[in-house]
Amino acid sequence: MADVHALYDQADQLKLEGNLEEAVAKYQEILAEDSNYVLAHAAIAVVQGRLGRHDVAIEHAKRVCEIAPEDPFSHTQLSVIYQRAYAGTQNPQYIQDAEDAMARSQMLQQGQQ
């Protein structure tokens, strides 16, 4: 079994160096070991968004919210991923989705469920 923390550090370094495809592959290695490793899902969402793969980015950002449903930041990140997807596609549905995710984040921050 690989050390997911070491793999994450390696993937993060690849991302910083601009090796985005390699970073995604390394993050996927992490998920093969631990499918609920939230940091890997969050990082994949960001990297896939940069690569223009907005559907995949959204899928991973949603997974973060499933793993950590009470974490306001998870929903804020989902909102940002939707905003970037809108910028890349001009699909107006992404704006509504972004607003919904941000509203959920704000409710959680205010202690509402």
What are these regions (language model features)?
Residues M1, D34, A68, H75, ...:
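Inter-repeat boundary and helix-capping residues of tandem alpha-helical solenoids
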Residues A2-E29, E33:
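Alpha-helical segment of the N-proximal tetratricopeptide repeat
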Residues E17-K26, L51-R63, A85-A103:
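Structural signature of tandem alpha-helical TPR/SEL1-like repeats
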